[in-house]
């Protein structure tokens, strides 16, 4: 259960072209130690939101942003060292091996290099830790970033379509990691796969036309309920 507020964003608007906002009056509150699923139709703004929080999008404005009780900006070093983001697609650091990438990230975050033995085993990644990232398959590249994310244990994990590219066993292992992450911090993850949302989330946020249109909690979190809302959006 969450014991306080970790992140609060009020009336976020974000755009690639100023006259075509992707997010509009988007507000979000995340508690400490909770798992929150973000779901929406293609083009609803899930990836745009994550890019904005990552500090990769210049076209945005918002009324307020509070992190751990204090006003902040997405590019503040203190915030960046307390969050890690796994993007839906990421082809950076192509000439690093996994071990080199992990060492680089740990140094950037100012933490000792974590022991990833169990994570590597759980994702069946043992044969790939010394392979250049550019030579990895889509699924194994995703595992590189997921292992790093769960090894770092930041206060906030942002995962954009984390299941994409994973095999069945790795997907099941990922569900366990997401569900258990409340021991260390908060996870916000986007997905178009209802199963992943329903199996792991304490709350589910439905993103429609650039803003949160519905929040599901507790027993409301069922594939049928969420599918019904998404279907009604598709009809609009």
Identify the role of each PLM range.
Residues 59-79, 214:
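Conserved ABC transporter NBD signature motif
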Residues 184-190:
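Conserved H-loop
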Residues 103, 113-129:
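Conserved ABC ATPase "signature" region
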Residues 1-25:
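A short, flexible loop at the N-terminus of ABC-type nucleotide-binding domains that lies
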Residues 157-161:
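Catalytic Walker B motif of ABC-type/P-loop ATPase nucleotide-binding domains
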Residues 39-41:
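The feature captures the beta-strand-to-loop junction immediately N-terminal to the Walker
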Residues 54:
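Helix-to-loop junction immediately C-terminal to a conserved catalytic motif
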